[in-house]
């Protein structure tokens, strides 16, 4: 893993910038994007035409994913959706790939799991929702194992996996942030895994800057709101973000879109020094030992990777809550009660 702010982090930042414009590099990579698009289209067509059959795992599946590379707010969306489905009378479970974990077979994730064995996002979901969570690169196998272990589960939420066509699904939700589709090019010329025109049941847009929604059908605003920060060593100790306004604060994030976290803190009245870490940064050691600050604010996704050996009293965790549009929840519930997986 590259050091914080090192070559890998700088490369990620440059690629992200290039993907927002149609510069010389993007145009030079378009032949490769065409090849990528052709391969992706062939995979989609194989399932759409019935040449390959998706696997029905026996209960409805809601896929929460994106068509772009990088963080868009999927994890807080999954957490909020699980809570909403439970409130609507369902018993939800969650499956995920377990990115960053050495997982080859279906594995249960509990609040006591380690991020290195479960993946940071699945572990966060397990801790926040207390729902059954299973991980495996093969999401079908994960869903089948989850159902075998928890026969009361009557709906499965797939954290990402939009392009995992083998898993039959009832509802597809696509999440965007303010960058939307960037320059509109497919990988590697742009950030798109699939064309923006890809079918989905609903689109969620998290734009903390303008709040504007694109003119797409069935599009809903996704609001991500920070809560009171809690102390890493003493989770019961909480402070409103406003209390950090007059302190020397470092904000650090090893997520797909760290600038969104920093913007959230600025909107709360803070003026932190910022440090973007590589996505899924492992925190093998403490990268903050030389920082002369009063407080270090990190994301929940990063916090699950910090074990009991971390003893930096400056570390505070900023939780984020996703507010789902009631109309979106009603749409999902209606589809779950009225349709079978396909």
Curated annotation (Swiss-Prot):
EC number: 2.7.1.130
Molecular function GO labels: ATP binding; tetraacyldisaccharide 4'-kinase activity
Pathway: Glycolipid biosynthesis; lipid IV(A) biosynthesis; lipid IV(A) from (3R)-3-hydroxytetradecanoyl-[acyl-carrier-protein] and UDP-N-acetyl-alpha-D-glucosamine: step 6/6
Chain sites annotated for binding ATP: 68-75
Any Pfam family hit: LpxK
Swiss-Prot/TrEMBL GO biological process terms: lipid A biosynthetic process; lipopolysaccharide core region biosynthetic process
Function: Transfers the gamma-phosphate of ATP to the 4'-position of a tetraacyldisaccharide 1-phosphate intermediate (termed DS-1-P) to form tetraacyldisaccharide 1,4'-bis-phosphate (lipid IVA).
Name of this chain's protein: Tetraacyldisaccharide 4'-kinase
Organism, as annotated: Burkholderia ambifaria (strain ATCC BAA-244 / DSM 16087 / CCUG 44356 / LMG 19182 / AMMD)
């Amino acid at each position: 893993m590259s050091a914080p702010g090192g070559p890998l982090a700088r490369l990620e930042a440059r690629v992200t910038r290039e993907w927002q414009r149609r510069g010389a590099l993007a145009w030079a990579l378009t032949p490769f994007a065409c090849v990528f698009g052709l391969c992706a289209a062939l995979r989609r067509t194989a399932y759409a035409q019935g040449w390959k059959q998706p696997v029905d795992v026996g209960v409805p599946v809601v896929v929460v994913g994106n068509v772009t590379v990088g963080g868009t707010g999927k994890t807080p969306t999954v957490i909020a959706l699980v809570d909403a489905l439970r409130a609507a009378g369902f018993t939800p479970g969650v499956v995920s790939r377990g990115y960053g974990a050495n997982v080859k077979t279906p594995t249960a994730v509990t609040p006591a799991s380690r991020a290195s064995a479960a993946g940071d996002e699945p572990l966060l979901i397990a801790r926040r929702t207390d729902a059954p969570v299973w991980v495996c690169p093969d999401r079908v196998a994960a869903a089948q194992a989850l159902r075998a272990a928890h026969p009361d589960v009557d709906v499965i939420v797939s954290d990402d996996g939009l392009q995992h066509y083998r898993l039959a699904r009832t509802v597809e939700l696509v999440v965007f942030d303010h960058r939307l589709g960037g320059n509109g090019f497919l990988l590697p010329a742009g950030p798109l895994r699939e064309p923006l025109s890809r079918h989905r049941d609903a689109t969620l847009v998290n734009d903390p800057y303008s709040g504007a929604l694109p003119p797409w059908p069935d599009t809903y605003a996704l609001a991500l709101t920070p809560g009171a920060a809690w102390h890493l060593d003493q989770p019961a100790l909480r402070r409103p973000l406003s209390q950090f306004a007059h302190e020397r604060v470092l904000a650090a994030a090893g997520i797909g879109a760290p600038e969104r976290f920093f913007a959230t803190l600025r909107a709360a009245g803070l003026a932190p020094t910022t440090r973007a870490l590589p996505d899924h940064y492992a925190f093998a050691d403490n990268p903050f030992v030389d920082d002369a600050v009063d407080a270090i604010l990190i994301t929940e996704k990063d916090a699950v990777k910090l074990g009991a050996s971390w003893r930096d009293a400056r570390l505070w965790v900023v939780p984020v809550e996703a507010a789902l549009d009631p109309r979106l929840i009603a749409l999902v519930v209606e589809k779950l009660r009225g349709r079978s997986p396909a």
